[in-house]
Amino acid sequence: MTTGLDTEAAPSHATDTGPSGPASLLFVGGTGRSGTHVVSKILDKSEHFRKVPNEARFHTDPGGLPDVLAGRTGPDLFAYRLRHHWYRNFEPARLTFRGIHRYVPRRRLEAATTSFLRRFEDEPEAACRQIFFDLLWPLAAEGHKAGLIEQSCDTVAQAGALGLLFPEARFLHVVRDGRDVAASRVGQARFLAHPRTMQQGLDWWEGRIRRIDVGVRAVGAGRVLALSLDDLVSGNRRRETYRSMREFSGLGNDASMEGYFERRVRVRNAHAERWREEVPERRQAE
């Protein structure tokens, strides 16, 4: 089967005009708290895709691969942050450790980082592409899958840079009622971090949406599908939304994936209209 590692040389900058067969690399992103993990779990049940278990983030965060390619961050600093932050770090707001340490062995991390630093000066794009696949593609290979899903929220916001680096990639932008996103984000922060109020949450959501719009314009609308979580979990567009997601990803009918969708993806699990719990009833009509 063809893998990302089979094409790890410096990529062509040709523009993808739209889906053609199953995607080998699918980025699922959004504002955060918009349903990216729900969509990734559905597609992970297919025969084709394996999802990265959590957000890898080294290709989307400040100081990550886009900043390295743009010259805003040096390769040595990137390598340091990869080893000491993205690999494993403690997040106070969630009171837990996060990072790629859960599925990337330390030996693989060191080998990939060493190769990246050795190659970057002569072939910066190829080095950035290679370290992504060196770290993450083994997940697909171990699962005998031909496609990989990465679900860092900012993948669509960074689609301009990622689209050049990975010309084979497609982007799913998961959208959700901004009021529910804001309420979920405030609840996630537990008042320990910004945003702490619904208004701050809405401002946060708006800023993220504007960044995503820039990313979509940069990569081209033909490589991005906007997918409504609200339509996916309920209503008369549920099946249509599922089908558009499946077809954009290049998948045919898949009994395992469809069975999971029918059993597990329901409005009761999506916390629709959660924002009403955070906003006094007298203000809900504003």
For the regions a protein language model found, what residue spans apply to each?
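The conserved 3'-phosphoadenosine-5'-phosphosulfate
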Residues: 183-186, 192, 217-286
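Extreme N-terminal, non-catalytic leader segments
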Residues: 2-25
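Conserved phosphate-donor/acceptor-positioning beta-strand/loop module used by diverse small-molecule
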Residues: 151-154, 161-186
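A glycine- and Lys/Arg-enriched "phosphate-lid" helix/loop adjacent to the NTP-binding pocket
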Residues: 172, 181-206
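PAPS-dependent sulfation machinery
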Residues: 53-148
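A conserved segment at the C-terminal end of the G1
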Residues: 37-49
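Hydrophobic anchor at the beta1->P-loop junction of P-loop NTPases
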Residues: 28
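A structural motif corresponding to the C-terminal end of an alpha-helix
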Residues: 138-142, 211-225
